């Protein structure tokens, strides 16, 4: 193959090492397998990316034990105890909130919740970055809120971004809300949806990937 043609194939990909002889490509973390094999990212080289820990190892371990014993425990029905413990570890939670059992919170110091919010059974708040939840929000059963992902194309480094859920939102059962998303005021997300982008206010959304269905409040 002509060398000029080969190099043209790699225009716009400055991070890749270009090798004309043998017609192979790779970067620092991506290796090319044998004949007919695809690329594989070396997970041993993955880093922390833009994640910055806000608490030391000891605090994180203490929280891990408390979460396992008292927060994520179906035999502890006391919502007030969960909220009290979360506040002791840095969560900002308003009045009138209810947390069903069990529930998981990875980092209470990265959690802000307004007033009169409901959290259903098995809700999972995986907040490596900040999650801000407004007032009068309902997070239903088995909802997964995750502020983390990975650089899937090159290094698998950790990537984090905050989630904002505005006042009056209802996220129904078994939905996933991904990093960097803002869900607008009084919106509804229907069951089993994957929210990969920000949503405007007062809409009903559903699906995987999520799409607009209709306005929540008819004119």
Regions found by a protein language model. Give the residues of each.
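Terminal amphipathic alpha-helical/low-complexity segments used for targeting or macromolecular assembly
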Residues: 1-91, 168, 186, 208-219
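A short, terminal or domain-edge coil/loop segment
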Residues: 52-55, 150-160, 187, 202
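A generic secondary-structure micro-motif detector
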Residues: 71-72, 155, 173
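Residues at secondary-structure transition points
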Residues: 76, 80, 84, 88, ...
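Left-handed beta-helix
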Residues: 95, 100-101, 106-107, 114-115, ...
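Conserved catalytic-core motifs of eukaryotic protein kinase domains, centered on the activation segment
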Residues: 149, 155-157, 181, 215-217
